[in-house]
Regions:
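Conserved PLP-enzyme active-site core in the AAT-like
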Residues: 2-3, 13-20, 80-319, 327
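Residues in well-ordered beta-strands of folded domains
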Residues: 13, 30-32, 57, 327-329, ...
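Conserved glycine-rich beta-strand-loop-beta hairpin in the small C-terminal domain of fold type I
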Residues: 26, 311, 327-353
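Conserved N-terminal alpha-helix of the aminotransferase class I/II PLP-enzyme fold
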Residues: 34, 39-91, 113-121
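Short glycine-enriched loop/turn motifs at secondary-structure junctions
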Residues: 50, 74-75, 215, 346-348
């Protein structure tokens, strides 16, 4: 008998233990702004990142931590971060790597809000994006690379076109040119696709959609695979390899990366937490974190039904004379059907376009 936790058990219990005083089983809502310290040494260790723990709810809170721990476990990552929205998750992920004068290579098949961020808003901050000509062709990604390229980005299953990205092939090109691959896995969820297993380095989600599932709360998740070593490229990623004067001269790649005292490469996710979330403030409330956690517990059951319904609707639409085309990778007629069967054998999501 296997002792490994199933998807469902992890989604319900990871990152939280019964309360030691009351023995309460459910995840508490830690509706607090601040925390006490055991002594001055404990406080100093937390603020210097010698020890990880709660300082202020803008950057960490036990209710938030339980949810990103569950999400990280389901994705197969090393650590995560819960923020105010999916849009905030993408923005922090991009700004955690790229700075003014830098460049991003992206799939053109994106959620409209993400396209606006890359095409209109980030250029105002000095960050430009090239949308590849053909996201299905790895060489199209390679051709878009510039000397100042800092990351690749795409959606595992795109909203709303429902095309499936060949994560494995795109990740191979990204790593050959020395940049990380960020994947938005909102449509697929970790129940259908685990992008880190196909070579992605970082995964983002709008937890508002399928993870929350009830339309009551807005949140976003970042999960770090810990696989990209920024120390290997000191000139390309100076923000990871030079001292951060706002954090006591901390060098993220050296002090928090591969070979650090934490036993995992946490340079990306801790930089996102203690630098960007600290300064930009896109924090999620503990109450919203609790509501999203309630949804996560039933994710697998809901996604199975969503996929079942989407297949039926797509198949019916395909038979209608008045419907010119149906975009759904779960249809055998889809150009992404074979890739969808490989990367997402449980189903290619519940979104379709016609």
């Amino acid at each position: 008998m296997s002792t490994a936790w199933s998807f469902e058990t992890t989604a319900s219990l990871a990152g939280q233990a019964p309360d030691g005083t009351t023995n309460a089983r459910a995840l508490p809502i830690y509706q607090t702004t601040s925390y006490t310290f055991n002594d001055t040494t404990h406080a100093a260790d937390l603020f210097s990142l010698k020890e990880l723990g709660n300082i202020y709810t803008r950057i960490m809170n036990p209710t938030q931590a339980s949810l990103w721990t569950r999400s990280t476990a389901r994705q197969g990552g090393v650590a995560g971060l819960l923020v105010a929205s999916g849009q905030a998750a993408e923005t922090l992920a991009f700004l955690n790597i790229a700075e003014a004068g830098d460049h991003i290579v992206s799939s053109p098949s994106l959620y409209g809000g993400t396209y606006n961020l890359l095409h209109y808003t980030l250029p105002k901050l000095g960050i430009t994006t090239t949308f590849v000509e053909n996201p299905d062709d790895p060489e199209s990604w390679r051709a878009a690379v510039q000397p100042n390229t800092k990351l690749f980005f795409g959606e595992s299953i795109a909203n709303p076109k429902n095309d499936v990205l060949d994560i494995e092939s795109v990740a191979k090109v990204a790593h050959e040119v020395g940049v990380p691959l960020i994947i938005d896995n909102t449509v697929a969820t970790p129940y259908l696709i685990r992008p880190l297993e196909w070579g992605a380095d970082i995964v983002v989600h709008s937890a508002t959609k399928y993870i929350g599932g009830h339309g009551t709360s807005v949140a976003g998740v970042i999960v770090d695979g810990g696989t990209f070593d920024y120390a290997q490229y000191p000139e390309r990623f100076p923000n990871y390899n030079t001292p951060d004067p706002s954090y006591h001269g901390l060098v993220y790649a050296r002090d928090l990366g591969v070979g650090s005292a934490f036993g995992a490469n946490l340079s990306f996710i801790l930089k996102a937490r203690v630098q960007l979330l600290r300064d930009l403030g896109a924090a999620v409330s503990p109450f919203n974190a609790f509501l999203i956690a309630q949804g996560l517990e039933t994710l697998s059951l809901r996604i199975e039904r969503h996929v079942e319904n989407a297949k039926k609707v797509a198949a019916w639409l395909e038979t209608r004379d008045e419907v010119e085309s149906v975009n759904y990778a779960g249809l055998a007629s889809s150009p992404w059907y074979a890739l969808g069967q490989k990367d997402a054998p449980k189903g290619t999501g519940a979104g379709l376009a016609f």
